[in-house]
Amino acid sequence: MQEYITLDVRLIHFFQKYWLGMARFGLFVIFFWFGILKVFGLSPAAPLVQKLFEATISFMSFDTFIILFGIFECVIGILFLIKGLERIVLPMLLLHMITTFMPLFMLPEVTWSGFLVPSLEGQYIIKNLVVIACAMGIASQLHPMHRHQHSN
């Protein structure tokens, strides 16, 4: 029994030591990889993005949008790697997540197979709850900003 307790303690310490770096790296991989696929026109998500684009945006071409959106995702990924830039990347992630979840409501014929039965595209979107949870974990490690009082 003592061996299990020792293993348990070691695993917990390992996870406590490395979770934050792994969370940052995982978010980088997801956002940079998926973003760069969009930039080079290789993203399997492009048809879904295009359907949402056609339902919402009309001020630029889709070809331009998908490249810019891919670059935006790459930047999010890179920023998650850099400690100290969390307050910049978290609002960017919020904007991205809002747009990512929109097809669940705006394109139900694509994202749902039936009531509470997501299609493959719907599952792809819903799994972003894990991305949000991971980002919340990173955000929970921030220290509150303090107002500096200046005397005249």
Regions found by a protein language model. Give the residues of each.
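Membrane-interface extramembranous regions
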Residues: 1-152
